[in-house]
Curated annotation (Swiss-Prot):
Protein name: Sm-like protein LSM1A
Superkingdom of the source species: Eukaryota
InterPro entries listed in its UniProt record: Lsm1, LSM_dom_sf, PTHR15588, Sm, Sm_dom_euk/arc
Recorded GO CC terms: Lsm1-7-Pat1 complex; P-body; ribonucleoprotein complex
Source organism (scientific name): Arabidopsis thaliana (Mouse-ear cress)
Lineage of origin: Eukaryota, Viridiplantae, Streptophyta, Embryophyta, Tracheophyta
Gene3D superfamilies for the chain: 2.30.30.100
Record's keyword terms, sorted: Cytoplasm, mRNA processing, Ribonucleoprotein, RNA-binding
GO biological process, one term: RNA metabolic process
Length: 128
């Protein structure tokens, strides 16, 4: 059995200040989760209640409900408290249904892939 290093323990105890507060959690894979922190352990594993994933593509966004959600600590990049009195998003953002945001994500991914292949084709030009 391995024990947590002292640095791990200090990191997770600082999460105690966030208990029962609305948080934004950024994961290694780029997903953004929001919810109420209900529990955590010495490895920064966390339990979010009323969790949802916020997907943003351009000026479109969608909140996908997840319910009670367990996050493995090693996947967390950033945790921050959200100000419940402040507006979460700029006024120009438009909320869309989940199906539409998935289509927008797919189109954005294909566009990025196309840009990458075009860059590779033009490498011989040495534009840098």
């Amino acid at each position: 059995m391995s024990w947590a290093a002292p640095d791990d323990i200090f990191f997770s105890t600082s999460l105690a200040a966030y208990l029962d507060k609305k948080l934004l959690v950024l994961l290694r894979d780029g997903r953004k989760l929001m919810g109420l922190l209900r529990s955590f352990d010495q490895f920064a594993n966390a339990v979010l209640e009323e969790a949802y994933e916020r997907v943003i593509v351009g000026d479109l966004y969608c909140d996908i409900p997840l319910g009670l959600y367990i996050i493995r600590g090693e996947n967390v990049v950033l945790i921050g408290e959200l100000d419940v009195e402040k507006e979460e998003l700029p006024a120009h953002m438009v909320q869309v249904p989940e199906a539409e945001i998935k289509r927008a994500q797919k189109a954005e991914k294909e566009e990025m892939l196309l840009k990458g292949t075009m860059r590779k084709r033009m490498e011989f030009l040495d534009l840098d």
